[in-house]
Amino acid sequence: MRSRDDIQPVLAADVLAYGERWPVYVWTVEHPQGLVLVDTGMVEPHPALAEWEPRCYPLAEELVARVAVVINTHLHFDHCGGNRLFPGLPIHVQARELADARADDEYTIREWVDFVGARYVEHEGEVEILPGIRLLPAPGHTAGHQVVVVDAEEGPAVLGGDVAYSFAELGRGETEGQRRVLELGALTWLAHESRPKVPERRS
């Protein structure tokens, strides 16, 4: 069983959204079978993203070299921009998410998803991909969004991606994915929040 100390947030970028700079976090999880990376941030800006004014903080080379497994919560540009750093490695994603990303040119930056050596492992529903690491569908932000549940000795921890932009939004439980996370009552990280917390449902 993992410890929550095995989970480390990594600031991968920040973007301009709603007039403010929003951080974009990814996470590493130390695991006996190798380092797991949840989301990959952004490696470089792209002309299509000019309005977001992204500032990218590429993953350290030594971290990239250690990664054994990649998980995408979803395939929007700020969560999959570093996927191409991992040709040949398994990248776990919900099948619906990958299909949607490939079907709509406005969904993401296509070449950041489909690159030479891309090896996607598609899932349909909840699955344990490594002992103590589960993928849980959490639709809402996108139809194929998923969260990562780490079964830690202190209790489960959730790496939530964009299941919500903020804990205030998460607490309202307006989407199916948000309600699933709230039901877990677990310590939760969000991609645009700097610290984790146990979310509380709000009326």
What residue spans do the PLM features occupy?
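Structural motif
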Residues: 34-36, 69, 155-159
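Metal-dependent catalytic neighborhoods of phosphoester/phosphodiester hydrolases
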Residues: 81-87, 199-202
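Residues that act as N-cap/strand-start positions at coil-to-secondary-structure junctions
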Residues: 21-23, 121-123, 142-144
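Short, solvent-exposed loop/turn segments at secondary-structure junctions
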Residues: 14-15, 34, 42-45, 77-78, ...
